[in-house]
A protein has these predicted regions:
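Extracellular structured ligand-interaction cores
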Residues: 34-38, 79-83, 91-93, 165-167
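Short, solvent-exposed loop/turn segments at secondary-structure junctions
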Residues: 69-75, 98-101, 195-198
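Long, compositionally biased interface segments
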Residues: 185-200
C-alpha cells in the first residue's frame, strides 16, 4: 500500500485536484498506475519524505507540477492533462506510460470531433508534419458536414500492426503545448515508458 503520510502535500493535492481524481478512486494505488510511475520518477526522498526533484537535465527546477492542465485554444470542456510539467531554462512536458504500451488497444482508428477538425492548430500540425488526410474517412451529419474525422496510423507513417500508441492523445497534448507556449520558447515533449524486461 502506498503511504501518503510520507509524501509532500503539493504532490497529493495535484492528484486530488486532477481530472482523474486518481487518489480517491484508487487508481493511483495500482502497480500499473502511470501516475504512480510519474511520482516515483520525479520525486526524491528528503528527510524521510517524498518531495519533487530539484534538478532536471543538470539544471535547477523553477517549477514542477503533476497533472498539469493544457487548455487548447478554442476547445471547450476539460483540458488534456500532462502527467508532469517541468520548468527550467526550457519547458518540459512529460507523458508517462506504464502498462498501456503492452495493451492490445483500440487506438488503431483515431476519431476526432469537429471542434478539433476545424481548429486552426490542428490544421497547422497536419500541414507542418505533412500528414496526408486525402483518403480520410468522415462521419457526416444530416447536412453533409464532417463531424468526426477518422484517421489511421498510416496517415502518420506508423505501421498498421502497431496498435499500442495513442495518437489521438498525442495530437491533443501537442495542441495543448502549442496553445500554452510561444514559438520562441525553448520546449520539449517527451514520453517516459515503463520497460518490462520480460516483454520483447
Amino acid at each position: 500500500m502506498y503511504n501518503f503520510t510520507n509524501t509532500s502535500k503539493d504532490i497529493v493535492d495535484a492528484y486530488k485536484k486532477g481530472k482523474g481524481n486518481e487518489i480517491d478512486n484508487g487508481k493511483f494505488f495500482s502497480v500499473a498506475s502511470s501516475s504512480r510511475f510519474a511520482v516515483a520518477s520525479f520525486t526524491e526522498n528528503r528527510d524521510k519524505q517524498l518531495h519533487n526533484i530539484q534538478m532536471f537535465e543538470g539544471e535547477p527546477i523553477q517549477k514542477i507540477q503533476f497533472e498539469y492542465p493544457l487548455r487548447i485554444n478554442r476547445i471547450l470542456g476539460t483540458p488534456p492533462q500532462m502527467d508532469v510539467y517541468i520548468k527550467t531554462s526550457k519547458e518540459t512536458f512529460v507523458e508517462v506510460k506504464c502498462h498501456e504500451i503492452f495493451d492490445e488497444s483500440s487506438h488503431s482508428i483515431i476519431k476526432l470531433s469537429s471542434q478539433y477538425i476545424n481548429n486552426s492548430l490542428f490544421k497547422e500540425i497536419l500541414e507542418h508534419y505533412k500528414i496526408n488526410t486525402a483518403d480520410r474517412a468522415c462521419e457526416f451529419d444530416s447536412e453533409g458536414n464532417c463531424v468526426k474525422l477518422q484517421l489511421t496510423r498510416n496517415h502518420f507513417n506508423v505501421l498498421s500492426k502497431t496498435t499500442r500508441f495513442d495518437l489521438k492523445q498525442f495530437l491533443c497534448h501537442l495542441m495543448g503545448i502549442v496553445s500554452n507556449t510561444s514559438l520562441d520558447e525553448n520546449k520539449q515533449f517527451i514520453y517516459l515508458f515503463y520497460k518490462n524486461t520480460n516483454v520483447e
